[in-house]
UniProtKB/Swiss-Prot annotation:
<comment type="similarity">
    <text>Belongs to the RuvA family.</text>
</comment>
<dbReference type="GO" id="GO:0000400">
    <property type="term" value="F:four-way junction DNA binding"/>
</dbReference>
<dbReference type="GO" id="GO:0006310">
    <property type="term" value="P:DNA recombination"/>
</dbReference>
<comment type="subunit">
    <text>Homotetramer. Forms an RuvA(8)-RuvB(12)-Holliday junction (HJ) complex. HJ DNA is sandwiched between 2 RuvA tetramers; dsDNA enters through RuvA and exits via RuvB. An RuvB hexamer assembles on each DNA strand where it exits the tetramer. Each RuvB hexamer is contacted by two RuvA subunits (via domain III) on 2 adjacent RuvB subunits; this complex drives branch migration. In the full resolvosome a probable DNA-RuvA(4)-RuvB(12)-RuvC(2) complex forms which resolves the HJ.</text>
</comment>
<feature type="region of interest" description="Flexible linker">
    <location>
        <begin position="143"/>
        <end position="152"/>
    </location>
</feature>
<protein>
    <recommendedName>
        <fullName>Holliday junction branch migration complex subunit RuvA</fullName>
    </recommendedName>
</protein>
<feature type="region of interest" description="Domain III">
    <location>
        <begin position="152"/>
        <end position="201"/>
    </location>
</feature>
<dbReference type="InterPro" id="IPR012340">
    <property type="entry name" value="NA-bd_OB-fold"/>
</dbReference>
<dbReference type="InterPro" id="IPR036267">
    <property type="entry name" value="RuvA_C_sf"/>
</dbReference>
<dbReference type="GO" id="GO:0048476">
    <property type="term" value="C:Holliday junction resolvase complex"/>
</dbReference>
<dbReference type="GO" id="GO:0005524">
    <property type="term" value="F:ATP binding"/>
</dbReference>
<feature type="region of interest" description="Domain I">
    <location>
        <begin position="1"/>
        <end position="63"/>
    </location>
</feature>
<keyword id="KW-0234">DNA repair</keyword>
<keyword id="KW-0227">DNA damage</keyword>
<dbReference type="GO" id="GO:0005737">
    <property type="term" value="C:cytoplasm"/>
</dbReference>
<dbReference type="GO" id="GO:0006281">
    <property type="term" value="P:DNA repair"/>
</dbReference>
<dbReference type="GO" id="GO:0009379">
    <property type="term" value="C:Holliday junction helicase complex"/>
</dbReference>
Length: 201
C-alpha cells in the first residue's frame, strides 16, 4: 500500500495532480481543498489512498492526513464511492462536515453534488459514532484556499468551471455559479471558493 508520496508537482488539471517522484509521474486525484493549495514546481508530501479495481488503479491524495482519514471513513459508508467522498471534502471544510454530521444538518449535506436525502441520512447514522470512535477533531478554515496556483493554459474561468464539474455539478450550474462571482475575482482558486460558498447558501 502506498501511504504517502513525496515529490514535485509537475502538472495540475483539476482535480488531478501529476506528482514527479524520483522521475516517475503519479496521477493523483485530490479534493479541491488540497488541489488549490498546490503550485507547479512545489515540493510536497501527499497522503495517499490507493483504490484497486479490476480495470484500473487510482491514487487519491491529500495534503492533510486528517482529510485522508475522513476520506477512508467515508468509503466505509454503504453507497459512497471515491467520487462522492472527494465531492464532500471539496465542498465542505472538515470543520463544517463534522458539524453537519453531529447536528444532523441534512439540508447542508444534500447541497453536495450527488448526495440525496437518503444518502445524507445514511451518512448521518453511520458516521456519527465512527467520528467519535476516531476522535476526529475539527479544523478551522475554508475548504478551498486562495493560494496562488498555476493551472494549465486555460483561462481561470474555464478552469474554475471544470473544477466544479469534476465535483458533479452540471455544466450549466458551474457556469452560473462562476458567472455570479467572476466580477469580484480573477484567480481560479478564488473563483472556485466563492462559487462553492454561494452554492452552499
Amino acid at each position: 500500500m502506498i501511504g504517502c508520496l513525496i515529490g514535485e508537482v509537475f502538472a495540475l488539471e483539476a482535480p488531478t495532480v501529476l506528482l514527479n517522484v524520483n522521475g516517475v509521474g503519479y496521477e493523483i486525484d485530490t479534493p479541491l481543498s488540497t488541489f488549490c493549495q498546490l503550485q507547479k514546481g512545489q515540493h510536497v508530501t501527499l497522503w495517499t489512498h490507493l483504490v484497486v479495481r479490476e480495470d484500473a488503479q487510482q491514487l487519491y491524495g491529500f495534503i492533510d492526513a486528517q482529510e485522508k482519514l475522513i476520506f477512508r471513513t467515508l468509503l466505509k459508508v454503504n453507497g459512497v464511492g471515491p467520487k462522492m467522498a472527494l465531492g464532500i471534502l471539496s465542498t465542505l471544510s472538515i470543520e463544517l462536515f463534522i458539524h453537519t454530521i453531529e447536528h444532523d444538518d441534512i439540508n447542508t449535506l444534500i447541497k453536495v453534488p450527488g448526495v440525496g436525502r437518503k444518502t445524507a441520512e445514511r451518512l448521518m447514522i453511520e458516521l456519527r459514532d465512527r467520528f467519535k470512535a476516531l476522535s476526529v477533531q475539527a479544523t478551522t478554515g475554508s475548504t478551498v484556499t486562495s493560494a496562488q496556483i498555476q493551472f494549465s493554459s486555460n483561462s481561470p474561468i474555464a478552469e474554475a468551471e471544470a473544477a466544479l464539474q469534476s465535483l458533479g455539478y452540471k455544466p450549466i450550474e458551474a457556469q452560473k455559479a462562476i458567472a455570479a462571482v467572476k466580477a469580484d475575482y480573477t484567480e481560479a482558486a478564488d473563483l472556485i471558493r466563492a462559487a462553492l460558498k454561494s452554492m452552499m447558501k
